From Swiss-Prot:
Keywords: Ion transport, Membrane, Mitochondrion, Mitochondrion outer membrane, Porin, Protein transport, Transmembrane, Transmembrane beta strand, Transport. It comes from Drosophila melanogaster (Fruit fly). The keyword Mitochondrion applies. One of its GO terms (cellular component) is mitochondrial outer membrane translocase complex. This is Mitochondrial import receptor subunit TOM40 homolog 1. It is a multi-pass membrane protein. It is found in: Mitochondrion outer membrane. Residues 1-23, 31-44 have a biased composition (Low complexity). Belongs to the Tom40 family. Forms part of the preprotein translocase complex of the outer mitochondrial membrane (TOM complex). Interacts with mitochondrial targeting sequences. It holds the Pfam family Porin_3. One of its GO terms (biological process) is monoatomic ion transport.
Length: 344
């Protein structure tokens, strides 16, 4: 519920080459020790160059955010009618009331609450963050996000249905100066001896290139052989206003491309291949922003011949936002329409 976003090549070759020649062809030192001074200057130059290169590398974010640019412009459609009322009770506490009427998802009322703490690490981020929603039957979705230091952040999510914890997940991210290390534990159970552990590492190689890997390990009685491990390699390349990102592993291939064509238009392309299911899906999406009209439109089409889009229009000066959603599947010959109103 909140908004968040060069190494100097110089001439290192000459300094390193001179130093190398000096080592290969040693000569008697003159009485004024000029060679020592020159060698020391060359070494200092190399050290300063390496320091400048390291300083230019920034934290690459997490592997979870690898495809974020492309995913953010894709339309999230809904069916039926939805009304949401957001009310801020203070600078740190907000509540929401949502009424949903649909034939696809369960209809009814949900109450939500969000608390943002006072521990600030940037002008746009404060911790801890507690958010969740609950329906009259007691089904609960809860999330807790806390940043313990400038580099260490933890996220916990849990889902409760019919008085039972059906899903839980704890993620810890350590953000170094030019790398991020993440560890996730999901659905651990000492009664069934099952769970999922995922380790991720992402390293900035150059200011434009980040490479990393992911290891997922699952164990339990329902897993073939009682345990399975999947290794993947990930990467992201940024060039100006475009971003290439990809994941390659035993389970399949996932490639995304994002381009900011202008201040009003963003486009993205995604190809996801599952080796286990022996299928691929390609998606082309775009987002149009018209600030003067208070309008945002997200649309797209995929290789399954589905066309989808969401239109969001802010009804200024009133604190209302109108949302219209549509999805058409030409293969199955069905159409879903949604209409929503957000107040506050």
């Amino acid at each position: 519920m909140g908004n968040v976003l060069a190494a100097s090549s110089g001439a290192p070759g000459s300094g390193a080459s001179n130093l190398g020649l000096g080592l290969q062809e040693p000569a008697p030192l003159p009485s004024n020790s000029g060679s020592l001074t020159e060698s020391s200057s060359s070494a200092e130059g190399l050290d300063s160059l390496a320091a400048a290169k390291d300083a230019a590398l920034e934290n690459p974010g997490t592997v979870e955010e690898l495809h974020k640019k492309c995913k953010d412009i894709q339309a999230i459609t809904f069916e039926g009618a939805k009304i949401m009322l957001n009310k801020g009770l203070s600078n740190h506490f907000q509540v929401s009331h949502t009424i949903n009427m649909s034939n696809v998802v369960p209809s009814g009322y949900r109450f939500g609450a969000t608390y943002v703490g006072t521990k600030e690490f940037s002008p746009t981020e404060a911790f801890p963050v507690l958010l969740g929603d609950i329906d009259p039957a007691g089904n609960l979705n809860a999330n807790v996000i806390h940043q313990f230091s400038a580099r260490l952040r933890c996220k916990f999510a849990s889902q409760i249905q019919e008085s039972k914890v059906v899903a839980s997940q704890l993620t810890t991210d350590y953000r170094g100066s030019d790398y991020t290390l993440s560890l996730t534990v999901a659905n651990p159970s000492i009664f069934t001896n099952s769970g999922v552990v995922v380790g991720q590492y992402l390293q900035s190689v150059t200011p434009a290139l980040a490479l990393g890997s992911e290891l997922a390990y699952q164990f339990g009685p329902n897993v073939p052989g009682r345990q399975i491990a999947i290794m993947s390699v990930v990467g992201r390349y940024t060039a100006g206003s475009s971003v290439w990102s990809g994941t390659l592993g035993q389970s399949g291939l996932h490639v995304c491309y994002y381009q900011k064509a202008s201040d009003q238009l963003q486009i993205g392309a995604e190809v996801e291949t599952s080796l286990r299911m022996q299928e691929s899906v390609a998606t082309l999406a775009y987002q149009i922003d018209l600030p003067k009209a208070n309008l945002v439109f997200r649309g797209g089409i995929d290789s399954n011949w589905q066309i989808f889009g969401v239109l969001e229009k802010r009804l200024a000066p009133l604190p209302f936002t109108l949302a219209l959603s549509g999805r058409m599947n030409h293969v199955k010959n069905n159409f879903r329409l949604g209409c929503g109103l957000m107040i506050g």
